[in-house]
Structure formats: C-alpha cells, structure tokens
Amino acid sequence: MIEAAMLWNEPNNKSHWDPVVDPDWSRFAHMASLAAQAVRAENPLLPRVLGGLSPIDPAFIRRLEGYGLLAHVDVLAVHGFPLDWNLWRIDEWPEKLAEIRAVSALPLWVTEVGVSSFGADEVQAWGVTRTAELLAGLAPRIHWYSLYDLPRTWEATTRHKEAEGSSYYRHFHMGLLREDGTPKLALERFARHTPELGICQWFHYEDPRLEQAVAWLKRLGVRHLRTGLSWADSFRPNALSWFDRQMEALADFDVTVTFCFTPEHLGLMPHHTSAPREPELFAQFCAQMVARYAPGRGVTATRPATEYAA
C-alpha cells in the first residue's frame, strides 16, 4: 500500500532541480504547495513528505518556511552519504538530524542513506552496520539507498567540484546488488537490520528488474519501500499500464511514492530538472496518481496527517 506521498526529490540538489531557472526556490515552493494541497484533497489521511534534502541544510528549510510551504506538508526528509560525498563524518548523523529538528517540529524521515562500494565492498558492509547503529530510533523511516547499482550507461549532473555531491561517480555503486543482480557483501549485513531499515529503489520506465527486485525485497524482510512515479514518464506510451504494474507488484510493502521530474516539453527549460511553466500541471499529476493508487476522497481526517507519519 502507499503510506506517504513525497513531493519531488532533493530540491536543493542541482541533479534534481535547476537553480539557474529558479535561483531563490520560489517557483519550487509554489509548485510543491499546489501539489501538497492537491494530494490533501484526494486523500486527507495520506502524509505529504517534502522531497528529501541533499545536502542537509536547515537554512533551506527556513527559506521554504518563509514561502509558506511547510504549512502544507506533514513530514520533512533528509538524504545523507557521508562516506562518499557529504562534508561531514558518518558519526555526525545524530547532529545532522538535530540541525533540522532545531528549525522545525515536523516529523523527520531519512529517505535516502547509503555508502558506496566504489572503494571496496568491505567499506560498504561496514557502512550498513554503522549507519543502522547511528540512526536506530532517531527517525520513523530510514531508507537505504539502494537495492541495485545504477546502470553505468546513465548520465549524471553534478555540482561544483568543491560542493557536496561532487563525487557523483560513487552514486552508481550504492546498491546492495550489482547492476547485473549479483549480491555484494553488504547485502547480508543489511538483512540483519530489517524491517527497521527500509529501501529506496527507483524503477525506470518498464524496468525489467521489477519482479526480481520484489523477490529480493521480500527475501530481505523489507517492509518500508520508497520509489517514484515520474511525471516525465507519464507522457510515454502505455505509461499508466507501467505505473499500474509497478504499484501492483509493490502492493505488499508500505510505499512512499515520490512524484517528480518535469516533462521536457513542459519545463521553462527542456530538462527534467527545470521548473515547469505551469506548476498546476504537476499538482494535477500528483492528484491523479493519489486518486488512482491511494484514493481517499470523501474521507474525513480525525487526526492530523503528521500523526500517521510518526
């Protein structure tokens, strides 16, 4: 089942939101506010999660609060990869969460955390164990990124070489499984920490790994899964059939579904990271997906959605 709707992914990361098009993030805040209200109208019980921050930046939260966005979301989220590209040590995880909690009382989830096997499989295996130790009890949801390595053929957009996120080549080696599906050393370590640790795994359009991934997730004892439904992909042929197949395959998990990626023909710039010309269209997409996969129109909320997110 879908347990939460996430609005965009890493909005303060150039790889997912173009700061040239929207240098003060006012367009993002407006778009996300519209989407949050649209989700609320379709299902008032479904928690709305602000796309996970990467890097973890309390000043960015204050900026969005200034635009009024935080009044329309129920959960904040952060992403961290301290052994690979963050400018802080892995042992600082509790402090990084405290920085966000110091500026907002909203529930806080860790919707991506990972360690790559780029340097050595043993480093990643140690990272799984240490991450579980550090984050245990500190967040209601902790999603390991990811089940599979990224396909090496994919392109990647990075930031300045001195900024967090610059070592993007490591991003392709975050999986517990290699691109060909063979297990890494970290897989067995991860299984020791489920269901407290969940998984974040994106499935690309008509991803042939879907059934195999579901089998692995069940074998590992995963309960909480984060994935995405791409607004850009919704314009591909037979997109709804693919979305239906994906959601049906994942029905046994508690799914946080992420809505993001601008269709090129709808962006201010022809790129999936661009702000859309008409943000209302993103809100419509979110509403349509919630109505299809997590319907709740007409339901009366007896508790704030934040309580369902705790």
Q: Predicted segments — roles?
A:
Residues M1, D57-Y67, A125-A132, H204-R219, ...:
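Short, acidic/polar
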Residues V39-L46, G68-H72, A102-A105, G137-L138:
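Short helix-capping segments at alpha-helix termini
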Residues M1-E3, N9, L50-G52, A59-L97, ...:
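Aromatic- and acid-rich polysaccharide-binding/catalytic face
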Residues M1-I56, V214-A310:
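Substrate-binding cleft and catalytic face of glycoside hydrolase catalytic domains
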Residues R101, T129-A132, A136:
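Generic hydrophobic alpha-helical scaffold/packing signal
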Residues L7, P44, H72, R170-F172, ...:
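Residues that flank catalytic or metal-binding motifs in active/ligand-binding sites
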Residues P23, A120-W126, L138-A139, H143-H204, ...:
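Aromatic-rich peripheral "rim/lid" segments of glycoside hydrolase catalytic domains that contact
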Residues N12-S15, L53-R62, F81-W93, S116-E122, ...:
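Acidic-and-aromatic substrate-binding clefts and catalytic sites of carbohydrate-active enzymes
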